[in-house]
Amino acid sequence: MAKQKFDRSKPHCNVGTIGHVDHGKTTLTAAITKTLSTKGWADFRAYDQIDNAPEEKARGLTIAISHIEYQTETRHYAHIDCPGHADYIKNMITGAAQMDGAILVVSAPDGPMPQTREHVLLIHQVEVPAVVVALNKCDMMDDEELLELVELEVRELLTKNSFPGDEIPVVRVSAIKALECGCGKRECEWCGRIWKLMDAVDTYIPIPPRPVDKPFLMKVEDVFSIKGRGTVATGRVERGVIKGGDEVDLVGLHHEPRKIVVTSLEMFHKILDTAEPGDAVGLLLRGVEREDIERGMVLAKPGSIKPHVNAEAEVYVLSKDEGGRHTPFFNGYKPQFFFGTTDVTGEIHLPEGVEMVVPGDHVKMKISTIYPVAMEKGMRFAIREGGKTVGAGAISQVLA
């Protein structure tokens, strides 16, 4: 069968369901597809089709993720759902499936639980910009006052983690009832609530700025000099656009950022006018010697990113079964940090009261590198030892 053409007429947005185990994330995902399928905007995916998620590799980690596609009247969505708690943690930290917004599923009879709190903290740390709440299993709650108390508790949890808890939409649903009914009508007591939830997602989760609108960034992968022409740096454009004549900052590793000019761009030995995100390009640079630039540095829009040696990070430590360490590590552990294209030696500083980190843990820590690296909030990295990945991290705050 011929592949369908990707429809670009609706703006695209990435969302995911998050929340405590057994609060109904996967059932809700199934209910969303069932309801939208009545309009022809989704293929219905049953619970067990979503739950046996295929495994993916990201930064040396195996993560089980289900990718579901659906549309509403105004948007096209890619929706991710993970079967296990650890899969969510790993996905958020590695950014394997980036989320522009999250649907936080909280079971009304139970209220926020430990994993609810952990997920909310993490989406704040890795900069998921917006959240909509699905208060699930409302068919099991007769007491309106109790429902209001649970809603208040969820709002307080969001506020505590720097989200606007008072204004975030909280929609009361019963995923199982909507699935059982399946009529998909807006006036239906249960299917109508799924529509209400999707309306909230449509209006409250913003369409992300396209990478072309963000400040230019390219991590340098290789460098060579062309006799009589100058120095060429190659890499993949991560965000923003660049054209011949633009000034960029060369950031990281040994000295303060310095300004250089991109004289021309090439891709597959052809001259380019402009390069966009995803393009693997060679940039011909003026005002820089071959010796002054190396793999691991970045070229960026002037002033947009700075080199740092200290940062705070959220880190997931691989378990032994995932190919990680067999033993814990302690304060002062000195691994390699892999930022984009290079390994930098550094040191780990554990929070007060944390003696050691055991494989399989998710922990907040401070890291310091032996020389400055271009870092910014939300940036992902791997922790390596002896050439193998032992952890994955995301910068939650740059310090100095």
From Swiss-Prot:
It comes from Dehalococcoides mccartyi (strain ATCC BAA-2100 / JCM 16839 / KCTC 5957 / BAV1). Its main location: cytoplasm. GTP binds at residues 19-26, 81-85, 136-139. Its EC number is 3.6.5.3. Pfam families: GTP_EFTU, GTP_EFTU_D2, GTP_EFTU_D3. Residues 10-210 form the tr-type G domain. Monomer. The lineage of its organism: Bacteria, Bacillati, Chloroflexota, Dehalococcoidia, Dehalococcoidales. One of its GO terms (cellular component) is cytosol. Belongs to the TRAFAC class translation factor GTPase superfamily. Classic translation factor GTPase family. EF-Tu/EF-1A subfamily. Keywords: Cytoplasm, Elongation factor, GTP-binding, Hydrolase, Magnesium, Metal-binding, Nucleotide-binding, Protein biosynthesis. Residues 136-139 are annotated as: G4. Residues 60-64 are annotated as: G2. GO terms for molecular function: GTP binding; GTPase activity; translation elongation factor activity. Residues 174-176 are annotated as: G5. Mg(2+) binds at residue 26. This is Elongation factor Tu. Residues 81-84 are annotated as: G3.
